[in-house]
Amino acid sequence: IGIQYQQGLADLCPASDLAEGLLNNVDRPPVTDPATGRILFENQALPHFNEVDECAGLDALVTNRLWRQLGLDPETTLHDVRYGEPYQLDGREEFVWVFQISGGAPPKHFIGGYAGAASYRQPPMYFPLGGGTLSGVSKPGEIVWSRIYVEDDRLKADLGRARALALPPEETRRRLSLTTPE
């Protein structure tokens, strides 16, 4: 699953990234049923995807369920691989990829959690009706990346491990400035 009409929807409604990022976080403000006042999906991360990317929703759902079964934090994040370049880290050269997405990223994944999160207005060229991002810098540490895709009319998956790095603030800003920083 992917939202095949994503670009068309951008002309019809504001970006939903901020709401999706909050819903994809276990610790979030309560959302109540207007009829009963009952808190909906309390202490649960609701996997979200807001991209046309093939199988993005399926990947988020499978990952969320797997993490819960393993007793791990169930929040998931969809990222685009923007670019990569060498960087000197601890006296040796590492190739550092920039993963970035405007929304659906839970504050749980950010340095400082909610304190490290910000929302920026989506650029008018992408979302004329507005809407906010949910932005932050990823916590350093081990990550698992995955993608699910269709090849030769069959569903396939790739999985891997990587490490999110703590870069100096000025390097983080420089890398953000090379893309759409919002």
Residue ranges and their predicted role:
Residues 2-182:
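Anaerobic metallocofactor- and corrinoid-dependent redox/one-carbon enzyme cores
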